[in-house]
Curated annotation (Swiss-Prot):
InterPro entries: E_motif, Pentatricopeptide_rpt, PPR_At4g14850-like_plant, TPR-like_helical_dom_sf. GO terms for biological process: RNA modification. Residues 391-470 are annotated as: Type E motif. Keywords: Repeat. PPR repeats lie at residues 77-107, 115-149, 151-181, 182-216, 217-251, 253-287, 288-319, 320-350, 356-390. The gene is PCMP-E79. The keyword Signal does not apply. This is Putative pentatricopeptide repeat-containing protein At3g28640. GO terms for molecular function: RNA binding. Belongs to the PPR family. PCMP-E subfamily. Residues 471-501 are annotated as: Type E(+) motif.
């Protein structure tokens, strides 16, 4: 064997060894051999060594080492740049991916240019760093360079930029520019609507996807069920349930099963929610939280508290803050004052969970329901953190129920300080205070507060409700005149009113 052939064989073995590294110790050993054999100047070999960092479980700890290897390369190639941007996107410093991208585009070498992989990794880094404005600039870049229409991963990444920034109109425009979007892209768009509380729009996207002939995956189904839960679309939820049965996803996917439990519970079918829960072959803390939340909403406090014992006993699951919040809410609805107080006081000792504002809000609500407003105020004053609006809001609701003007004024004062600039929340607090004044016949003060509302330019948010008929969810808003079938609706209401008067 010639000397050259021997060198080539050694280099090949070292490069293969670098691809098998899964600990930093192995990477360092291989790097040392690279230096000994002169491979540390070979960009192909170094790119393979850098790729090994992606397999490390504690990448953040060794990010500086990866960066130093990159800095030792005299002229990195495109693959090395791509690898470093990818490492940044996986680390706790994703913003540095932009630095490597800028270094890359400054290179004067003709063969060093961003590819679709570069943009894909860069978009992932921007998403992790919440650099949405940069992501939009990348969108312009990929459109200008023709990458957007040619790569599916880049299309999905750009769509996610707008969805994560909650710019849903722009997200829809981007989506409509994608030729033949796959299920993943439909999922991203639908999830964007649902996360913003626009369940009806999310279901419309789901129906569009079905009309296009695409079959939903587990993620689509989970998101669609969440949308059904938001708007109370029980009929559509049942249809999805039948689809899930055919796919056997209740048994195989815990998130689909959990979404079904949550949907039935929020649509008023707690018994069906329990039946679905019993069929889950695997249950996690979210499954139990959905069931406990359902029990809490319908006042089944004892069943919710029993679930807290069962999840540890049956599944060996440690409750999280959401589960405990559900149990506290159940105690509030059921009037179990002592049990709720005991749980709050022992959360940290028993469950190693520090109570948050929402937990205190539940107990304040519970105390107010029991008429213990002074105790509720005492609890607020002893909180280890500054009370937020949710806590004072719970006290204000109790003051309205029990017509307590003094504490109501205190609660509103704190709410206005906390919600300064939030017009809707300011209006809600002032309306509550005026109602308290009216309830105790203090009409001058009530009128004064109403005047404050008008001076602030606060406009009351109209009430609304949704109704599902034949799978279509319609939103009815108080005072709305924009519905396309307004004339027919008013005609039917008039006829029903006439019939009702005749019956009376």
């Amino acid at each position: 064997m010639s000397v050259v052939s021997s060198f080539h064989q050694s280099w090949k073995s070292l490069i293969l060894a670098s691809q098998r590294c899964n600990t930093v110790k192995q990477i360092k050993s291989t790097h040392s051999l690279f230096i000994i054999h002169g491979l540390h100047r070979n960009t192909y070999a170094i790119s393979k060594l850098l790729t090994a960092f992606l397999h490390l479980p504690n990448l953040n700890k060794h990010f500086h080492y990866a960066s130093s290897i990159f800095d030792s390369i005299e002229i990195p190639n495109s693959f090395v740049y791509d690898t470093m941007i990818r490492i940044c996107s996986r680390s706790s410093q994703p913003h540095l991916g932009l630095r490597y991208f800028l270094l890359m585009v400054k290179e004067e070498e003709e063969d060093i240019a961003p590819s679709y992989l570069t943009f894909h990794f860069l978009i992932v880094a921007c998403l992790k760093a919440c650099f949405f404005s940069v992501g939009k600039q990348i969108h312009c870049w990929v459109v200008k360079n023709g990458v957007f229409l040619s790569d599916s991963h880049v299309q999905t990444g750009v769509l996610r930029i707008y969805v994560e920034d909650k710019l849903l109109l722009d997200a829809r425009k981007v989506f409509d520019e994608i030729p033949q979007p796959d299920v993943v892209k439909w999922d991203v768009l639908m999830n964007g609507y649902v996360r913003c509380g626009l369940g009806s729009e999310g279901l419309e996207v789901f129906r569009e996807m079905l009309v296009k002939g695409l079959e939903p995956d587990e993620f689509s189904v989970t998101t669609a069920l969440t949308a059904c839960a938001q708007v109370g679309a029980l009929a559509q939820g049942k249809w999805i349930h039948e689809f899930v049965k055919k796919k056997s996803w209740i048994e195989s996917d815990v998130f689909v099963g959990t979404a079904l439990v949550d949907m039935y519970a929020k649509c008023g079918c707690i018994e069906t929610a329990v039946e679905v829960f019993k069929k889950l072959t695997r249950r996690n803390v979210f499954s139990w939280a959905a069931l406990i939340g359902g029990y809490a909403a319908y006042g089944y406090a004892k069943k919710a508290m029993t679930c807290l014992e069962r999840l540890e006993r049956e599944d060996g699951i440690k409750p999280d803050s959401v589960v405990l919040l559900g149990v506290l809410a159940a105690c509030a609805h059921g009037g179990f004052l002592e049990e709720g107080r005991s749980m709050l006081e022992n959360m940290e000792a028993r469950y190693e969970i520090t109570p948050k504002h929402e937990h205190y809000s539940c107990i304040v609500d519970l105390m107010c329901r029991a008429g213990r407003l002074d105790d509720a105020l005492n609890l607020i004053e002893k909180m280890p953190m500054k009370p937020l609006a949710s806590v004072w809001g719970a006290l204000l609701n109790g003051c309205r129920t029990h017509k307590n003007v003094e504490l109501g004024e205190l609660a509103v004062k704190n709410l206005l300080d906390l919600e300064k600039g939030n017009v809707e929340e300011e209006e809600a607090a002032l309306v509550q205070l005026s109602n308290i004044y009216f309830s105790v016949q203090r009409n001058p003060e009530a009128s004064k507060v109403r005047g404050m509302i008008e001076q602030r330019g606060v406009r009351k948010t109209p009430g609304w409700s949704v109704l599902e008929v034949d799978g279509n969810v319609t939103k009815f808003v108080s005072g709305d005149v924009s519905h396309p079938n307004l004339l027919q609706i008013h005609t039917v209401i008039h006829l029903l009113s006439v019939d009702a008067l005749q019956i009376l």
